[in-house]
């Protein structure tokens, strides 16, 4: 009985093969166009169901028109890589056609394809033609169309109802065209669309509610569109979306608000975007997210505290090939219980904290090879790893520092080094060494450092102010992460900003030099003198520290101020603990150079000067005019001397009186004179001295005094 069944089955198989052979022979010999291949081939439906279909393959034959003797039984017609630009009625008899491939031809208009009456067509390939627009209802006869590939064309315009009639469309490829806008009305006719690829179009931007009609969309690709921002409501309505790609755009931050509107997202691709940092809340409460890619980001420098928060289903994170990624906060992950694979290779990481790994209870594998690892206490846990975590490519894990261990394998070094505390190290690429910003903008400087124990981070401004997280200022704000925010930056805010990371082991510093509108205040000067107010007889000056050292330790041993103009030069010793002086008894409308010279306890000298002109005074007495008047009076007296002896007597009397009145100006009129001012003014000016006196006292010991910017002194 079994043998009989076997014989029957064998006969059926032979009969089937014979019928297939006869069918193929019939198609090939009597109804197959010349040079084409006609046969039964495997075919998969858009739902990936396997079938066999009568196929006519006329690919790459340089045809200029469709062959005329096609069988009406044809189900798949392949005409890829030909030179066809227009059809007549060759397709009208192909009632059973389910797939049509016109890719890589010369069509410029969809109407010229001749798609009328192809009611059974499910897949249409029109990619790599020269189509420039899609007009209203251009595909309305394709009621069963499920896949439309019209990518890599020249389409710049799509009418609002271009996809009318395509209610069964599941997959739409519009990528690599010339679209500048995305119109949500396109999708009103495609409610069942599941896959949309619209990347590599020069769109001006994504708009709110752009994809709202696509409630059944499962995959959206927005790659290579030069997008710089994603509005908060751009993804509203995509309740079924599972896969989203922003690959190769210009996003500078994670579009966290938009991502919160996609509740069922499982796969997110943010690769190759210039995102600077992943910060708190960027990936939060994404309850279905399983895989996240943040690879190949040329500007990514840090993953901050709580950057990944409450992601209960995340199993894989890839953050590789980021050349500036040098810092991952020890608390970067919070409530990420399912993470199994953590890929961090080929970055600029010096270390990864043990606490970071311990916060991931289900972690199975980690990759940190091909990073410039610092082999000290921060990664000492690797050698004492007692978990089941597998390090991928451990033989590619080498020390980059300290210098004596450079090039050694990590595990080899950590066996020798068991220290539990180590110096802070500021991440090299966390902020730029130099930058030029526009006046009035807000500037952010991100300073990140790793050490055990965790370091305190603060900043020192160009004028020596220390900025901490407790600092209250309208100009500066420091986050707990170490980011300095400078609001409404002005030219006077330019200079060298120093980040200091400090713990019990010591400190590390790094400097950023900021230009404002291309201008940089002289950063080589430790101090700079400014004119705050000018009057006819006085000048109010102040000075500021402009140093890249910590000014809390900056001490001056002496300070000297010099006032100079063509008629007078004098010098004064001033107290070292003040920043403001009022210079009085000056002449109106006169040019002066005011210089401040300070010396520190190491006898290093710094000098800053400013030129200033006093204001005009209507009733000010001009000395040169007085001198001219005096000479004229003498001449007139001589002329009238012969007239009256009495007049001569009066003249000499007045002359004698004026001489007594101006006795104190004789020295003042000497251009090269340098006088001690205590001859002219009250005893308060005994703080001052002439140039000669300054030289005598220059070597005197002066107790260093810490600079106090709150005091103001007056010179009379």
Swiss-Prot record:
Cell location: Membrane
Signal peptide: 1-25
Membrane topology classification: Single-pass type I membrane protein
Extracellular side: 26-631
Glycosylation sites: 96, 117, 385, 517
Membrane topology (Cytoplasmic): 653-716
Biased composition (Basic and acidic residues): 691-700
Start and end residues of each Ig-like C2-type domain: 424-515
PROSITE patterns: FN3, IG_LIKE, LRR
Disulfide bridge partners, by residue number: 447-499
GO cellular component assignments: extracellular matrix; extracellular space; membrane
Polar residues: bias regions: 702-716
Entry's transmembrane regions: 632-652
BP GO annotations: positive regulation of synapse assembly
LRR repeats: 73-95, 96-117, 120-141, 144-165, 168-189, 192-213, 216-237, 240-261, 264-285, 313-335, 338-359
Protein name: Leucine-rich repeat neuronal protein 1
Organism whose genome encodes this protein: Homo sapiens
